[in-house]
Amino acid sequence: MKTRTRITLAVLSGILEPLGFAGFGLFPLTWIAKVPVLLAARDLAPRLAFRYGMLYGLIAYFGGYHWLAHTFSTFGGLSPVLAWLGTMLVCSYLGLLFGFLITLVSQLKLPPVWSLAFVNPALELLFPNIFPYNIGASQH
């Protein structure tokens, strides 16, 4: 698979992920959104799988936390540029979770549906987060 195709699949996953959370009501998308990025990460070295997972996570969290820039600017007194940089920093940090998730799931010899069911909640439990934006919050 070409690199451009893999990037497109990771971006697609990142766009679909936030649609499964409150406000949209498309809760199955939080599981379905992982399919394109898992296809992109298939048969890759762990560091490459991590990159695609990280891209997916960055976009997904930005979709969910775009409001942070306004909060940083309005209540934190930051300039708009610093507010957006702060938002990207938070989304990058949180995107690490998806980087690790996709790396682990792509490297396990189990079918992705089984490994996702165990690895995703385990990582969410272990990974310190700022806001409760875990998969359980989407399953309403």
Residue spans for each PLM region:
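Membrane-embedded alpha-helical bundles of multi-pass enzymes
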Residues: M1-H140
